[in-house]
Amino acid sequence: MEYAAIVLAAGQGKRMKAGMNKQLIDLNGIPLIVHSLRLFEEDAACKAIWLVVSETERQTMEKLVAEYQIGKVKGLVNGGAERQDSVYAGLKGMEEAEIVLIHDGARPFVAKPILTKLADEAAQSGAAIAAVPVKDTVKLADKNSVARTVERKNLWAAQTPQAFQYELVLAAHEDAKKHGFLGTDDASLVERLDKRVTIVESDYLNIKLTTEEDLLFAETILKKRENQL
């Protein structure tokens, strides 16, 4: 199923403590955001990429897109104060598509079959997310004490991309905006409309680079892939 992608690169990533937007951090000689953009550039089903950026870094991002020849980027959109604002800006700024995949630019290791499954599932059901079963035991806390242990077998850790029929996710964002609801991902906005969100099982390599330790893990993944070539 053909789709368009919104890639989010407007956040500053303060937990990375890099003193710069983590999207620009060098990862094996290439900026992190370029690794993520190439996921979609190299997928034949992706017909357009809309890159959401910080206004102050717009020129830098434009140069990277040109330098690394990411030809599917059809436009750059200025992000907002919150992630949700940035996604909404991307939805409003893009050319309408039947299916849209929304992806965090700090996740450079999505497997191509996941992109295909997400787009196909969204076309069928309206909404689909990449996710993995939770491996750790999860405790519900009351301040510094354990209130109870949560049953793990039904818990999934949501990732991106998250795929939607365009009209559905736009309506979900507009409803959330109208009612002042701030969600932690786009699927949560669709859930508010009592719409079904399908899970597409992903893998544990699809990490979001958030801390300095994540960078070490990412470099290990890249080196392993190079050795397999």
UniProtKB/Swiss-Prot annotation:
Annotated positions for site Transition state stabilizer: R15, K22
E.C. numbers: 2.7.7.60
Catalytic activity: 2-C-methyl-D-erythritol 4-phosphate + CTP + H(+) = 4-CDP-2-C-methyl-D-erythritol + diphosphate
Annotated site residues (Positions MEP for the nucleophilic attack) in this chain: R152, K208
BP GO annotations: isopentenyl diphosphate biosynthetic process, methylerythritol 4-phosphate pathway
Highest taxon above the source species: Bacteria
Alphabetical list of SUPFAM superfamilies matching this protein: Nucleotide-diphospho-sugar transferases (SSF53448)
Presence of keyword Transmembrane: no
Pathway assignment: Isoprenoid biosynthesis; isopentenyl diphosphate biosynthesis via DXP pathway; isopentenyl diphosphate from 1-deoxy-D-xylulose 5-phosphate: step 2/6
CDD domains: CDP-ME_synthetase (cd02516)
Primary role: Catalyzes the formation of 4-diphosphocytidyl-2-C-methyl-D-erythritol from CTP and 2-C-methyl-D-erythritol 4-phosphate (MEP).
Family: Belongs to the IspD/TarI cytidylyltransferase family. IspD subfamily.
Name of the protein in question: 2-C-methyl-D-erythritol 4-phosphate cytidylyltransferase
